[in-house]
Curated annotation (Swiss-Prot):
Superkingdom, taxonomy of origin: Eukaryota
Sequence positions that bind heme b b562: 84, 183
Species lineage: Eukaryota, Metazoa, Chordata, Craniata, Vertebrata
Subunit composition and interactions: The cytochrome bc1 complex contains 11 subunits: 3 respiratory subunits (MT-CYB, CYC1 and UQCRFS1), 2 core proteins (UQCRC1 and UQCRC2) and 6 low-molecular weight proteins (UQCRH/QCR6, UQCRB/QCR7, UQCRQ/QCR8, UQCR10/QCR9, UQCR11/QCR10 and a cleavage product of UQCRFS1). This cytochrome bc1 complex then forms a dimer.
Gene: MT-CYB
Gene3D superfamilies membership: Cytochrome Bc1 Complex, Chain C
Protein's UniProt name: Cytochrome b
Amino acid sequence: MAPNLRKSHPLLKMVNNSLIDLPTPPNISAWWNFGSLLGICLATQILTGLLLAMHYTADTTLAFSSVAHTCRNVQYGWLIRNLHANGASFFFICIYLHIGRGLYYGSYLYKETWNTGILLLLTLMATAFVGYVLPWGQMSFWGATVITNLFSAIPYIGQTIVEWAWGGFSVDNPTLTRFFALHFLLPFMIAGLTLIHLTFLHESGSNNPLGIVSNCDKIPFHPYFSLKDILGFMLMLLPLTTLALFSPNLLGDPENFTPANPLVTPPHIKPEWYFLFAYAILRSIPNKLGGVLALAASVLILFLSPLLHKSKQRTMAFRPLSQLLFWILVANLLILTWVGSQPVEHPFIIIGQLASLTYFTILLILLPLTGALENKMLNY
C-alpha cells in the first residue's frame, strides 16, 4: 500500500500533527477558540499591512497625505486601512480574552507556553504602538513623544536611550522611518514566536475546562475543531467587517485627523483603548520612575502567575471564591480602561489610584491566599 503523503512528507507531516491528527480534549469550550482567532488576526493584519505599505511613504512631510491618498485614490484603500486599524482592536480583544481564559483555567501552569505567550503580548503591544505613529497625525506624534519619553525615567542612561530611539533631540523624520521599519519587522517576529508558542503547547497538549489530564479521552482536531474554528472565524470577521464598514472611526481619536504639529499639544493625550488600563496605572503614581515601573509591572506581573498558584485544583471551575476575585479583577480592568480615557482631575485621580492598587492586590495577594484557603476548606 502506498504511504499516506500527509503522514510521510516531511512538511505535510508537521501540518498533519498540528492541525489534522492532533489529539485534542473533547470538552474544550469556545474559550479555546481565541488562539486560532489570534492566528487569523495576525494573517489579516500582515496582508492588509503589506497592501498599505505599498502606498505609504515614511517621511514626515508625506506620511499624513500618503495615508489620505491611500484612502481616497487607491482601489479599496479605505477598506484596507479600516480593516487594518480595526483589526488591531480585534487582535487585542482576542489576546485579552485568551489571557483571561489562561488565568481562569490555570493554563499558565504550562510555563513555557505561558511565558512565550507573554512575550507575544509584549511584541504585539510594541507593534501596535509603533504602528499608531505612522499616520503622523496629532495623537500619533504626541503619543510617540509621551511614551518614548518614559524611558528617560531610567536613571543615568535614560536620556541617552531616548535620544538614541528618536534619532535626534525630538520625535522627527528619523523616528518615523525607524518606526515604519520596526512596524514591518515585528509582525514577522510575532509569527515566529507563535510557532514557538505552538511547539511548546503541543509538547503537553491542550488544557481543558476541568483542568484534569485528558490523555485517556482525546479526539482528532480535524474535523471537529477545524469546523469549530471556522465558526469562530465567521463570528469574529462579521463584527470586524461591520465595524470597518459602518463606523470605522469609532475607536480612533479625532485628533489624528489633524496633521502632526510639534507646536500644538492636544488637550488630552491618550493612547488607543487597548492601552488605557496600563495608561491609567502609569498616571496613578505621581512620580515618573514609579509610574514607569508600575506600567511595566502591570503586564510583567503575568510572569508570576505560575509561581502564585497555590490551589491544588488547576482551574477555577470549582472554586467560587477565586471566581469571584477573577470577575472583580475583570471589572477592575474595565474601570481602569475607563479612567485612562478621562482627564486627570478630581474623581478620576482617586478612582484610578484605587483601581491600580486593587489590580496588584488581587493578582499578588488575594488570589494566592484564596487558593490556599480553598485547599483548607476542601480538606486538601
